[in-house]
């Protein structure tokens, strides 16, 4: 079983939320929500390994290390290619003696309807958003099992729970629903040695959304605004930390109330 975090009841809540001395790996960590996750983890004391594909991560890694006094590393990896994911974990294990936290944050969205998109576009979204999470988890699981501990926090989406409007994005919605069910399945399979959770962001200003606020989304959200990347990243901190030592199989929705209406 996964026991409570060490001295859980006697520790201050701020200490439980601290990641000091822990090693975190964030796939898709060079930009957007992934970059915010790396920054928040580093602020909490974790060393960070940024795994990127299209956006080089060296600049982000250097800035995060300098700002927080932690160690950061990078490597390039296409999560849809199993051999590349295996290679990434081999590189990670060269610098981290333990891997405490893994975040599969890879994701794309073409924003096309089922009629307009091609077979190849649909398959590509499933490959990146769902199969990519599996490929990362497939490599993280044996490491967690050998260590006897680990926390995997994947990026799902409110789109995996509801069909959000006004845009049409059937492939994205389908892939993120799959991520949520995959995480629940892994939480049960890995119950003896790891915690597995996911965060489902709502409409967020990030690189995926062009780095701008989308006014057309605001009327659909009770808060009448888009979320900030750091507001989303804070949820990952909780699930990755010792404070969440009884949380597994959780889909933490952070959407400004969108899925409540």
From Swiss-Prot:
Keyword Nucleus recorded: yes
Localization (cell): Cytoplasm; Nucleus
SUPFAM superfamilies membership: NAD(P)-binding Rossmann-fold domains (SSF51735)
Gene3D superfamilies linked to this entry: NAD(P)-binding Rossmann-like Domain
Principal subcellular localisation of the protein: cytoplasm
Keywords: Cytoplasm, NADP, Nucleus, Oxidoreductase
Catalytic residues of the enzyme: 157 (proton donor), 172 (proton acceptor), 176 (lowers pka of active site tyr)
GO CC, any one term: cytosol
Signal peptide: none
Positions annotated to bind NADP(+): 33, 78, 105, 172, 176, 206
InterPro entries: NAD(P)-bd_dom_sf (IPR036291), Sc_DH/Rdtase_CS (IPR020904), SDR_fam (IPR002347)
EC number(s) on file: 1.-.-.-
GO MF, one annotated term: oxidoreductase activity, acting on the CH-OH group of donors, NAD or NADP as acceptor
Family statement: Belongs to the short-chain dehydrogenases/reductases (SDR) family.
Protein name: Uncharacterized oxidoreductase C22A12.17c
Organism: Schizosaccharomyces pombe (strain 972 / ATCC 24843) (Fission yeast)
Organism taxonomic ancestry: Eukaryota, Fungi, Dikarya, Ascomycota, Taphrinomycotina
